[in-house]
């Protein structure tokens, strides 16, 4: 059992919690909680860390034969955990690499989220979770978006991170041009949108662009989109939260496609 916060493994866990560079260099990320553990593909589990009390009371709940395991004292576990009320399970998970080509070659009609400089971990995790629920086929992120493997993002995805393909790209306008070549219409969520979002047809291949929480889409990214659309706003509110706006757009596409299928 590990009983000291000065232990080398404990220090590595804290590095993985706090530093995107450490996660990238090792090709792994740190996840936490029982529900996420059950969602994690077993072949991607590299190592499991359980609190002493969890191990004593609930070890028989888990089918983790063959997965390396360490027990941490409850005090050390609380030191490492990123949550206010730790559940008692931390684990190292191997990262999965996806390319833009992987996302575009799927047989399903493309429904993509394109995120420009999104910074809030909760927003990103919620968008990924909603994307899976709405039937999206992938997420494309500018290189300056928040790290997908940030612990707060991981928790917010509720397991969708294991199933929703995503890729970070260096040049977002160039990628938008590539999407156009593939017949995917790109829609920028923008205050200057020519049409309301529900006036467009999203039954064919589509990609929605969502920008930074405070500043929206960068001008060069907005200009690279084929169309600008807006969500109607009443009262004195100028715009919606990024994750809420993304959800509205994705579920409108989902609604249209479901309706279209019933007509065929």
Question: Predicted segment positions?
Answer:
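Short pre-catalytic strand/loop immediately N-terminal to key active-site residues, enriched for Gly-Thr
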Residues: 27, 115-119, 230-238
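Short, structured coil segments at secondary-structure junctions
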Residues: 44, 64-65, 157, 162, ...
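RNA substrate-binding interface of SAM-dependent RNA methyltransferases
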Residues: 98, 104-193
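Structured adenosyl-cofactor binding patch, chiefly the S-adenosyl-L-methionine
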Residues: 130-134, 148, 153-161, 219-264
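Active-site/ligand-binding-proximal alpha/beta "capping" segment
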Residues: 187-237
């Amino acid at each position: 059992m590990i009983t000291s916060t000065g232990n080398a493994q404990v220090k590595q866990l804290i590095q993985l919690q706090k530093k995107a560079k450490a996660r990238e260099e090792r090709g792994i990320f740190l996840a936490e909680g029982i529900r996420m553990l059950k969602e994690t593909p077993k072949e991607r589990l590299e190592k499991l860390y359980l609190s002493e009390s969890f191990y004593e009371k609930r070890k028989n709940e888990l089918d983790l034969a063959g997965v390396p395991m360490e027990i941490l004292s409850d005090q050390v576990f609380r030191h490492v955990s990123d949550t206010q009320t730790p559940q008692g399970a931390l684990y190292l998970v191997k990262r999965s690499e996806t390319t833009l080509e992987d996302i575009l070659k799927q047989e399903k009609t493309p429904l993509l989220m394109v995120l420009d400089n999104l910074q809030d971990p909760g927003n990103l995790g919620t968008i990924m979770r909603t994307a899976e629920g709405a039937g999206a086929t992938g997420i494309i992120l500018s290189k300056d978006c928040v790290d997908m493997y940030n612990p707060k993002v991981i928790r917010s995805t509720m397991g969708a991170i294991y199933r929703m393909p995503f890729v970070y790209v260096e040049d977002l306008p160039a990628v938008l041009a590539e999407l156009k070549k593939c017949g995917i219409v790109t829609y920028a969520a923008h205050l200057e949108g020519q049409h309301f979002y529900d006036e467009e047809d999203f039954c064919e291949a589509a990609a929605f662009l969502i920008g930074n929480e405070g500043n929206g889409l960068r001008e060069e990214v907005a200009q690279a989109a084929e169309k600008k659309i807006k969500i109607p706003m009443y009262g004195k509110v100028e715009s919606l939260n990024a994750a809420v706006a993304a959800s509205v757009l994705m579920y409108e596409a989902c609604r249209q496609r479901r309706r279209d299928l019933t007509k065929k």
